Amino acid sequence: MDFPRFLLSAYLLLLSFAQCQHYYLLRPIPSDTLPLLELKEDPDPIYDPREKDLNETELRSALGDFDSRFLSVGPPQDRYAGNEDLDEQELQLNLAGMMPKDIKNLDFDAPWGKKRKASKKLKRRLQMWLWSYSFCPVLYAWNDLGSRFWPRFVRAGSCYTKRSCSVPEGMVCKPAKSTHITLLRWRCVARRGALKCAWIPVQYPIITECKCSCAN
């Protein structure tokens, strides 16, 4: 098969792959609200925990499970978790996980009719090309939430957004799955003229998977 035919076949497949399902416009996607909006805190230092409130032994006991993959008490040596600074070509070379079913199950014989069928080698080549183009990696970086959270450093995920993930352009990488980790938050409430403060557990969402989806 000559190269122009290969490009035509790939383009037709991408056109079908990039079609936005109509129900995406009717049904909200739960993870669209990730990541969290920027937290707004009162800047008055009276609401900050004091040194005696930051006993690590007591806080670890109150927190329970401490997942060091996503949590750090002190500033991590490597603020970026390995893939934030990678360029587009390097990201595409680091395909991870299982090949998406919608790419794996594409009918590569349709553009050629019943008499001619694409070879296994060509099918694999097209699958890998489509996968690398529509690949949506999760980029992890450490965020400092401030002294009113413990641990204050969280490894948060975001989706790659430097280019569209479809041809024609229009689809973008968006959060598809997430998990939650438990943090402690310093909460102060005014009661009877006095300020009462304590550490309370809160759930913080972490993006774990991104997917090529409709922009709207």
Swiss-Prot record:
Q: Which family does it belong to?
A: Belongs to the noggin family.
The entry's keywords:
Chondrogenesis, Developmental protein, Differentiation, Disulfide bond, Glycoprotein, Secreted, Signal
Q: What is this protein called?
A: Noggin-1
Q: What is the first-listed, main subcellular location in coarse terms?
A: secreted
Does the UniProt entry include the keyword 4Fe-4S? no
Tell me which Gene Ontology terms the entry assigns under biological process.
cartilage development; dorsal/ventral pattern formation; negative regulation of BMP signaling pathway; negative regulation of endodermal cell fate specification; osteoblast differentiation
Q: InterPro entries, from UniProt?
A: Cystine-knot_cytokine, Noggin
The organism sits in which domain of life? Eukaryota
State the compartments where it is located.
Secreted
- The answer to whether UniProt assigns keyword Secreted to this entry is yes
Q: Pfam families in the record, alphabetically?
A: Noggin (PF05806)
What cellular component terms from Gene Ontology apply here?
extracellular space; Golgi apparatus; synapse
Signal peptide stretch: 1-18
**Sites carrying sugar chains:** 55
Q: Summarize subunit and interaction data from the UniProt record for this chain.
A: Homodimer; disulfide-linked.
Q: Which species does the entry assign this protein to? A: Danio rerio (Zebrafish)
**Primary role:** Inhibitor of bone morphogenetic proteins (BMP) signaling. May play an important role in the dorsoventral patterning of the embryo.
